[in-house]
């Protein structure tokens, strides 16, 4: 398989795992390249300044398509700080190509939540070569 430091454990039991969190004084806006090789959770600590497109990829040198096998999934989280004017993730891409996520509750968000932390979670399932299903959710923390 491909993977990111993959280990085959057979029928082993996993007690716990730790996921890499990157925290940056960055404002969500424009197109954001989410490099899954770098982190599982990305925390933006500056108020969002515009709606944004999230492009999920392996990293600047590796496509998500090339690092995942068919039948694999990854789950990532994007924490976005919101101020008095809130913005939202209005588009999702994988390796630069648009995808339409399936949102929890059936509807994509149309706004962010003021004076909150908005946490977007995405489960990306590779169903065929360069074909992905994206399950998404937005949760407000205040």
What kind of region is each of these model predictions?
Residues 95-113:
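Terminal beta-strand-rich extracellular "head" domains
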Residues 3-94, 125-142:
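Exposed extracellular interaction/assembly regions and N-terminal maturation sites
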Residues 116-125:
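Extracellular disulfide-bonded cysteine-rich modules/repeats
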Residues 29, 113-117:
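Solvent-exposed, conformationally flexible loop/turn segments
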């Amino acid at each position: 398989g491909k993977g990111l430091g993959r280990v085959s454990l057979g029928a082993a039991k996993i007690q716990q795992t730790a996921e890499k969190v990157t925290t940056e004084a960055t404002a969500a806006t424009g197109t954001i390249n989410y490099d899954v090789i770098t982190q599982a959770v990305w925390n933006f600590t500056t108020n969002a300044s515009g709606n944004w497109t999230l492009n999920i990829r392996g990293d600047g040198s590796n496509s998500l398509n090339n690092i995942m096998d068919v039948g694999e999934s990854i789950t990532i989280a994007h924490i976005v700080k919101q101020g008095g004017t809130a913005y939202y993730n209005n588009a999702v891409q994988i390796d630069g190509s648009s995808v339409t996520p399936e949102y929890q509750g059936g509807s994509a968000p149309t706004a962010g939540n003021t004076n909150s932390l908005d946490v977007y979670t995405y489960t990306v399932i590779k169903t065929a070569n360069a074909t992905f299903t994206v399950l998404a959710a937005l949760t407000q923390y205040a």
